[in-house]
Amino acid sequence: MGCVTASIACNHNSVISKEADYPIEVETGPEILTGSTRLKAGTAQKMILNMVSTATMVGIGKGNENLMVDLVRTNEKLEARLCNIVMEAAGCDRARAVQALSEAEGNGKVAIIMILSECGRLKAEEKLKEARGHVRRAVMQT
């Protein structure tokens, strides 16, 4: 098929590792409860997948520094979290973050760019598009 493949195995020299283009092997040793694969091995695999997905999210512009800036507000808790993220990323107070989020129609990335670049929503959206979704690149544009 020509697809690039990756694998995660919790044993050294596993069969799947030999078949994958990018094998990840982490030796967790035997499980405390023989026959179970959900304890050490399952936890290790979950941690690896979390690291891979986090790196991917940052790579495609969903993160800025250590902040998840591409958060969708689906409830009050996430709305408050997004406001806090905008405040931290833009170095502004709550009132300014709320105002920018309102003007940006809830788009945290656009709100951050609006504040840091001192521009309106349309210009911020344009800058974000030109920067391929990356807030830092958008802010650095002149």
Outline where the language-model segments fall.
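Glycine-rich phosphate-binding loops that contact phosphosugars or nucleotide phosphates
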Residues: 1-47, 51, 56-60
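Short, amphipathic alpha-helical interaction segments embedded in low-complexity terminal/linker regions
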Residues: 51, 56-142
